[in-house]
Amino acid sequence: MDLSALYYPYSHTLPAVYAQTHKLVAYNSIYNAFELYWLCVLPLLVLGVPLCLSCLPVRLSLPAKLGEKPLAASSRPEWDPTWVVPKHIAAIMDGNRRYGRTRYGLPLKGHQDGSQRVVDFMNWCVGAGVQILTVYAFSTENWGRAQAEVDALMNIFTSFMHDIIPQALERNIRVCVLVSDGAKFPSHIGSAIEKIETATAHCTAFTLNICASYGSRNEMVHTVQAIAAKVAAGTLAVDAIDEAVVSEHLLTKNVPDPDLLIRTSGECRLSNFLLYQIAYSELIFLDKMWPELNYDDFLHMMRTFNLRKRRFGK
């Protein structure tokens, strides 16, 4: 019996069935792989990228801000000749004690370093074309500190005024000491103040104002008293009192109001400093302690000042 006829359909159709089945399996594998990608791989990518980015250090994704460590040489700011230079800068030199305590274990050493930074900062101002620098050296509230600390601060203050006279005369810098309450000053402090002011009175290139035993509220009280005395004496009419008259009775009567006020140490308050004079000053608060400031920080201040839009209420 010829069995080839029986096997003929089988021998030809079976490979075709296998081939068709193979194609279906391949198609199903591709589909399953694509489906697996959408269900598993893609969510991992979507979630993984933000998670990876979140692990990067913040300072890699944010611009450097004032108060951080000195920038790398390639990122350091440079002086821009198109910048507008503030004529008058006021500085609250905060953080000396904390700096001295942290670095040396001696708060007083921080004040000594801080006095040197005044000279550095003044030199940066002179080089930039700033005309006036007013620094907050000792407030009326500082008299409430421990007597030993007050005595040490008075000694540093006296030494500073004595040591800076030669440099001030050489560079034509006038030094003025603004005192709103001098009753507690020892006599030798008063003599040192008179000496430095007299010695530099003729200097005109730059003015350094040192606020010592100063408080803005105390200054305003004396201003009101002086104006009231003139009204009582008949030399000043009440209707004639205006902002100009008030300014003429302030300790800063001979200088324009500050264009820029800075404060170091991360504190964001004015601490009874030039409250009347800074009505339209630009304010910059820095995280660094006063003795830590460097020239890069100064350039950052100038750049920040020039990014501000000073409208004076208009």
Where are these regions (language model features)?
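Flexible, compositionally biased loop and terminal segments
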Residues: 2-314
